[in-house]
Amino acid sequence: FGERGYHDAAIARIAQLADVAIGSFYTYFDSKEAVFRALVDSMSAELRLAMTAVIVAAPDRLAGERAVIAAFIEFCRKNKALSRIIAEAAFVSEDAYRRHYDKLAKSYAASLTKAFGRGEMSDGDMMVRAWAIIGMNIFLGLRFGVWDESADPAHIADAGIALISEGLRPR
């Protein structure tokens, strides 16, 4: 799916790459859409686990947010198909697409709420904040992780965390 897109991907090729017979493929999945949904769910879970580990390892929430920006750019560089597969899911399997972002936003908002409880950030609508930060990270990952790898992720993370922590207010 990552190389050719959903519509050009063939079950025979998927089975060949997975080193299974086509009949065995149908033991686990009843259609190409079913395997695509499973792939979206799997990639989504892998992404959430990777970014959660980065946040948890940080000394505080703002340091964690900065680390997540850099880590997400690196994740996108190593998993270039992720952006394409998730974007395609909007058209192929809207339920998987929405589930990906809904789970991500809910876990992110819960994590922000915990950080507020520890006194690491201000109060506010954590769900709105989660969606805003996720949106920023998605486009930073696309631009600097998938389209062009020349920028240093640390530099991008510095600019991103400045926006998160200071906003656009003049200093």
What are these regions (language model features)?
Residues 45-52, 75-78, 94-120, 127-132, ...:
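Amphipathic alpha-helical packing segments from all-alpha helical-bundle domains
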Residues 171:
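C-terminal effector-binding regulatory domain of bacterial HTH transcription factors
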Residues 73-95, 139-146:
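Amphipathic alpha-helical segments used for helix-helix packing
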Residues 3-7, 58, 79, 118-119:
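Short coil/turn segments at alpha/beta junctions that flank glycine-rich nucleotide-binding fingerprints
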Residues 2-34, 38:
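Helix-turn-helix
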Residues 38, 52-78, 129, 133:
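Hydrophobic alpha-helical connector segments
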